[in-house]
Amino acid sequence: MNANWENCRSMVLSVLRIAAGYMFMLHGSAKLLGLPHVEMFDGLQLFSLYGVAGMLELGGGLLVLLGLFTRPTAFILSGQMAVAYFIGHVAGNGYALIPLMNGGEAAALFSFVFLYLAAAGGGKWSLDAMLCKKRQG
C-alpha cells in the first residue's frame, strides 16, 4: 500500500508542477509576447518591473513545466510571487492578510505552490529525475 501511495504521490506532484509551470508561463507570455492579449501589457518595456517579471514567468515557468532545475527555479519564483504580493497587492491597501480583498490570490497561491515544489522537487515525470537516473547508472 505504501509503495502505491508513494508512486501516486510522485505522479500527482508532477501534475501539480506541470500545471503550475504552464499557467505561470501564460502570465509571462501575456506580458512579453502578447499571447494571450492583455491590454494592460500593451507597450510594456522589457526592463521594467513587469517586463522582468514576465521574463521570470516565461523562462521560469518553462523550466518548472519541464522539471529542469526545479528546486532552485521554484525557490526563485516563490520569492518573486511573494514580492509581487506585497508590492502589488498589499502596498497601500488595508487588507494585507486577506488576499480575497486585495486581489492577490493568484500571487499568494503561486508563491506557496512554488515553495512546495522547491522543497519537494520535480517529481517522477521531470527532466531532473531523468538526469538523476542517467547519472546513477
Whereabouts are the PLM-identified features?
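Extended, low-polarity transmembrane helix blocks
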Residues: 1-33, 50-55, 59, 66-137
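Membrane-interface interhelical connector segments
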Residues: 33-50
